Design a protein with these regions (language model features):
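Alpha-helical elements of Rossmann-like donor-binding domains used by nucleotide-donor carbohydrate transfer enzymes
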Residues: 20, 36, 78-81, 106-110
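Short beta-strand/loop motif that positions the catalytic acidic residue
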Residues: 59, 64-67
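Glycine-rich beta-alpha junction loops
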Residues: 53-55, 69-70
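Conserved loop-alpha-helix segment in the C-terminal half of the alpha/beta-hydrolase fold
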Residues: 69-94, 101, 114
């Protein structure tokens, strides 16, 4: 984490250390790809993590969730808990936190299935 010039105290940029990125964030990607992603990641402001998001959309509309079973950022049990609480249709995929990169077909399939189910 690093300070943001002109930001209020305690607001910092958050990022994953390049040395840890492959093993925790991209643990199912080839080493070279994980290294490139680590080097090119963009930080997020920690202020975004504390802002209210409003009423949950899943309370009003059907939901789907892809659970990455080898995710080391958001544990699979936590993902399942959130998906079950939302009443989501759950698809489990052997994927890290970056399932959209490591398993794009599974992610696309879930999106297409959700689209077809709601037409």
């Amino acid at each position: 984490m690093g300070p943001i010039p002109g930001a209020p105290p305690g607001v910092v940029d958050a990022y994953v250390k390049q040395s840890l990125f492959p093993s925790c964030f991209a643990n199912d990607l080839p080493a070279r790809k994980a290294a490139v992603l680590a080097a090119t990641q963009r930080p997020i402001s920690t202020v975004t993590l504390g802002q209210p998001s409003g009423p949950p959309a899943w309370a009003e509309i059907p939901s789907w969730a892809l659970v990455g079973t080898v995710d080391r950022v958001i544990l699979p049990a936590t993902q399942r808990f959130m998906a079950e609480r939302a009443g989501a249709r759950i698809v489990k995929v052997k994927a890290s936190h970056l399932s959209m990169i490591s398993r794009p077909g599974a992610v696309t399939g879930l999106i297409v299935a959700a689209d077809r189910a709601t037409r």
